């Protein structure tokens, strides 16, 4: 058995936003055609309440593939060197069920979630839409900024976060890649 292992750096190198947005467009199209099997996630709570193990299987009809995302959610990890969400995505051969690959789930989730938003924005937003409001300043804010840049030319970006300090850090770190200044909003409504 030969299993490919792809860490976070490998995922980010291979699954770029310009690759993932069209993939998500295709996956959403397959979902609407009934070519996807995606049971509800299964959650197991640890008896002491310290965390959750989540299992999320799925099958895609085109290209035929299936796999499983296994993730832990450990709220006690906030403020430690460990992420609160960690896991892997496992892919299997459709014909024989053999394990093919184990990939870092955090990086896939960050990119895929935003790429789905990018695909939907591309399909539904006006061509001249260029204002972006981000509610939150974490990982998803950064990947959503990249996804929106992929599908629309941005003219204005506003961010609100529960922590103004985090919003300011996000604006500093992301302004160059945004191509426009990032404004800090005082409230989610203002953003």
Name what the model sees in each region.
Residues 1-110, 118, 128:
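N-terminal ligand-binding/catalytic initiation module
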Residues 2-4, 156, 181-183:
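Conserved beta-strand segments of alpha/beta enzyme cores
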Residues 3-6, 149-153:
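Acidic/polar active-site rim loop that often engages polyanionic ligands
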Residues 75, 137, 162:
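Cofactor-binding loop segments of dinucleotide-utilizing enzymes, especially the Rossmann-like FAD-
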Residues 112-133, 139-151:
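Short internal alpha-helix immediately C-terminal to a glycine-rich phosphate-binding loop
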Residues 134-135, 160, 185:
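Structural motif
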Residues 150-178:
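NAD(P)-binding Rossmann-fold cofactor-contacting core
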Residues 178-191:
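Short acidic low-complexity segments
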């Amino acid at each position: 058995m030969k299993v490919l292992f792809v860490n976070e750096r490998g995922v980010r190198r291979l699954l770029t936003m310009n690759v993932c947005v069209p993939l998500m467009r295709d996956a959403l199209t397959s979902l609407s055609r009934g070519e996807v099997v995606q049971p509800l996630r299964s959650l197991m709570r640890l008896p002491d309440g310290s965390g959750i193990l989540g299992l999320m299987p799925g099958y895609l009809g085109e290209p035929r593939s299936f796999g499983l995302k296994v993730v832990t959610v450990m709220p006690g990890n906030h403020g430690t060197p460990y992420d609160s969400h960690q896991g892997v995505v496992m892919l299997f051969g459709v014909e024989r069920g053999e394990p093919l690959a184990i990939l870092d789930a955090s990086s896939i989730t960050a990119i895929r979630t935003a790429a789905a938003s990018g695909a939907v924005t591309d399909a539904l937003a006006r061509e001249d839409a260029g204002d972006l409001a981000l509610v939150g300043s974490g990982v998803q804010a950064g990947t959503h900024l990249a996804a929106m840049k992929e599908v629309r030319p941005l003219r204005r970006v506003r961010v609100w976060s529960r922590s103004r300090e985090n919003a300011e850090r996000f604006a500093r770190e992301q302004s160059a890649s945004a191509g426009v200044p990032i404004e800090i909003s005082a409230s989610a409504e203002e953003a």
